[in-house]
Amino acid sequence: CGCPSYNPAAKMGRAMVRAMAKLKGDRYRSQKMNHMMFGAFNTPFQPADSEFAWLSLNEENVTAYDADELCGFIFTLNGFESLLDIMLMVYDPKGWKMERPGLPVWFLSGEQDPCLTSKERFLEAVGLMKKVGYQDVTYKLYDGLRHEILNEKCKETIYQDILEKLE
């Protein structure tokens, strides 16, 4: 769930990652690149006790995330490059091979998820699916929710919505 919006700086970011990887190696974990990619995500939720407040409206989820040693890591430069490559591929209409135009596509996201950047950018992603030929493209934004909509206190509602779409 969630839909990262296209970032016009993705090509420049990828070039920076590649240059940094030549100097540091592709397994290097760059604090600078992490800040460039995710640093602004928490801004709308300040003041916040965690740099990961952007993940969830539910403070218990954020506290558990902060406490989990497997969470909160910094991507390697290779990881950032892959993330940017995927974004550039997904948002390039030339790369889509339309085989099943009737396949339903449903976007769902928290309305306050910083990955979607803005509702307008989110709707551009929805529009791209129509542009490449999908005929049944719909979306739902969940009011007040952030990135991890399937872990919120109201998750049963979201799972019910998903179940209804699948039936």
Q: What is each of the regions a protein language model found here?
A:
Residues 1, 90-91, 161-163:
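Non-catalytic cap/lid and distal C-terminal segments of serine-dependent acyl enzymes
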Residues 1-70:
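Alpha/beta-hydrolase-fold enzymes
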Residues 97-101, 132-134:
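Short, conserved loop/helix-junction motifs that constitute active-site signature segments
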Residues 107-109:
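Short beta-strand/loop motif that positions the catalytic acidic residue
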Residues 111-114, 145-146:
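Acidic beta-to-alpha connecting loop that harbors the catalytic carboxylate
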Residues 114-124:
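Conserved alpha/beta-hydrolase "acid-adjacent" motif
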Residues 130-167:
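Catalytic active-site module of serine/aspartate enzymes centered on a nucleophile-bearing elbow/loop
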